[in-house]
Structure formats: structure tokens, C-alpha cells
Amino acid sequence: MTVYNFNAGPAILPPSVLSQAQEELRDFAGTGISVMETSHRAKEFEAVNNEVEARFKALLGIESGYRVLLLQGGASTQFAMIPMNFLGADQVADYIITGTWAEKARDEAQKIGKVHIAATTEAENHNRIPSQTELQFSENPVYVHLTTNNTIYGTQWQSTPETNGVPIVADMSSDIFSRPFDASKFGLVYAGAQKNLGPSGVTVVLIREDWLDKGAKNVPTMLRYSTHAKNNSLYNTPPTFGVYMLNLVLAWIQEQGGLAGMAEYNTRKANVVYNAIDNSGGFYRGHAVADSRSQMNVTFNLPTQELEKQFLAEAKAQGMIGLPGHRSVGGVRASIYNAMSIEGVEALASFMAHFAAKQG
């Protein structure tokens, strides 16, 4: 039986990447040892480390002005690290609240400095993305923080908002490299790797080089971006296997036609599942309003909790795992990140149609 992995993260990885990692597991780059045994100072690993930054920039079409850092601690550490470095005592940062992870980022920033809420969709249980006209920025924010995709609620920014020239800081953990984006609008982008870029354990940061000089100097060494930039992300021992896997995934994305190719593929996949919802006669109810729907996380409910439990049990029995929704929304969540195949979403849509038909 084929198993389709709809987990929200750690999530599905490209089968070809797993096969390559399997082949090289005991002999990395002709060394005769595993990458997990290789010194992070070895030239073979440093080559991988450098390849990651080169591939990352190539996919975005940028040659200079930015650094790619490979950190640890997940996006949750970034929630605090960003304001520690860039939110001064007499400054304000604007936060747009579209879900749980944006709330967590705001909470950490409030411990460090002044935070202004530019918009929030909390009253609607975060079922949509605020419109441009709803955004009320403070007079002179040092940055505007947003979460580009909301895994729990199944919403996603369809375009980058205008911020009057203020740099955007974005948590892209769940949709990074699922589509192109204009790096010039961002001062800093961060993402845990475990949804679209590889296994858990690596946090990727794209940061403008001029921001490296702006960082506070009284921040502990490991929490300064400049520390990691100066040391090529090798200040301390990195998660070498995670970095190696990240490099393989980036190469795979390039092979799929880059970010434009991924965007086209992800749109096709998402449409398959959303069509199953929209054509169900109301049996399936999407949580997100139509113009805020995520292409990465499709969230929906059934008429009763009992039917939801039955749906999840039968889907699992047919090889579709990781579908239970987050407790904040309940129901079903299908995470269809870059590596999810079109066959996977078609299997889910077919199951959805048959399940609804059985209920009469």
C-alpha cells in the first residue's frame, strides 16, 4: 500500500532525495564515512555548506546584498532573536497577526521592546489574511513582521503587502520556496527547514547584509546574526546531516524548474483538493475564506465531529496519514508541501468524494 504523508511538519521529503541520501549514507563525497561522521571543518562538508548558500541565492535570483545563515533553535528562537538584535529601546516594531505563530512572535518581541499591532484576524479565528487597507502601521517602525503561511488555519498571503518602504521580516517556515518572492522587500526571512526544505534541525535565515551591521552589540554571541555571518554558519558545530539534506532538497527544487516551477505545481495540487471541497455540496467546509486559501495547508471540517473521526480513521487505513487538524480548528488538515505528489492529492480528493457519497 502506498503511504501518502500529509503531516504538517516534519513533513514529506522528495523520494529521489531520500534515495540519494540512502545511497550516500555510508560514503559521503568519497570519504568512506557518513556525512553524520564528517567533521564540519572538513573540506567536503564546507563545500556542502557553501553550496547551500549558492543554491539558495540562485533560486531567488540574487547575487549580492544578502547572506544565507544556517542556524539552530527553530523559528521559535527567531521570534526572540530578531527583536533582540533589531528592536531598540526607543523603537517600535509592527506585527501583523494572522495565527498562532504570529502571536508567539509578537509575544517574544513584547518582552524586548515596543510592539504595534498593524492588523489582526483573531476575532474571526484567523480564517483570512488582512487586506492592504486594513493595515495600520505605526509612524516609524523598524520592521514589519508577518507570517506568510499559517499552517494551523490554512491561510496564506497571496502577495507581499506594501509597507511604505519599511523592511519586512517574514516567517516563511511553511511556504518558503513554494513560489517566487521578491527578496528586496525583506530585511530578513527565516524558516524552519522541516516543512519545505528538509528534515528538522536547521533554521534558514536570509538577511540583508546591511542589517548585520545594525544588530545590537550587547546580545549574547550565539544570538547575534553577525556571529554566524562572520563564521559562515560554522561558529559552533552545525547539524551537519540536516545541512546536507537541505542541499539535496535545494538541488531538487532547481531540477523542478525552480520557484516558478514549484509555484505552478503547487497551484495544480491545491486546486485538486479545494475542488473536492467546493464540489461537495457543503459536506466539506473550508476554514479559510476563498481569497486567503493556503496552497500548503488545506483545512476543512465535516458536518459532525463523529464524521471527522470516521473520515480520519478510514483515510489512515487507506494510507493517508497526518490528516488530523490542529486543536484550534479541529477537523482535517492536508499539508501538501513541495514534495507532495499530484498522485497524493488525487488520492485524497478521490477518497473525499467517495466518503461524502457514502453519507448520502
UniProtKB/Swiss-Prot annotation:
L-glutamate binds at R41. The keyword Transferase applies. Pathway: Amino-acid biosynthesis; L-serine biosynthesis; L-serine from 3-phospho-D-glycerate: step 2/3; Cofactor biosynthesis; pyridoxine 5'-phosphate biosynthesis; pyridoxine 5'-phosphate from D-erythrose 4-phosphate: step 3/5. It catalyses: O-phospho-L-serine + 2-oxoglutarate = 3-phosphooxypyruvate + L-glutamate; 4-(phosphooxy)-L-threonine + 2-oxoglutarate = (R)-3-hydroxy-2-oxo-4-phosphooxybutanoate + L-glutamate. The modification N6-(pyridoxal phosphate)lysine is found at K195. Pfam families: Aminotran_5. Binds 1 pyridoxal phosphate per subunit. Its cofactor is pyridoxal 5'-phosphate. Its main location: cytoplasm. It is an enzyme of class 2 (transferase). Keywords: Amino-acid biosynthesis, Aminotransferase, Cytoplasm, Pyridoxal phosphate, Pyridoxine biosynthesis, Serine biosynthesis, Transferase. It comes from the Bacteria. GO terms for cellular component: cytoplasm. Pyridoxal 5'-phosphate binds at A75, S76, W101, T151, D171, Q194, N236, T237. InterPro entries: Aminotrans_V_dom, Aminotrans_V_PyrdxlP_BS, Pser_aminoTfrase, PyrdxlP-dep_Trfase, PyrdxlP-dep_Trfase_major, PyrdxlP-dep_Trfase_small. Its EC number is 2.6.1.52. It is found in: Cytoplasm. One of its GO terms (molecular function) is O-phospho-L-serine:2-oxoglutarate aminotransferase activity. PANTHER family: PHOSPHOSERINE AMINOTRANSFERASE. Belongs to the class-V pyridoxal-phosphate-dependent aminotransferase family. SerC subfamily. Catalyzes the reversible conversion of 3-phosphohydroxypyruvate to phosphoserine and of 3-hydroxy-2-oxo-4-phosphonooxybutanoate to phosphohydroxythreonine. Homodimer. This is Phosphoserine aminotransferase. It comes from Herpetosiphon aurantiacus (strain ATCC 23779 / DSM 785 / 114-95).
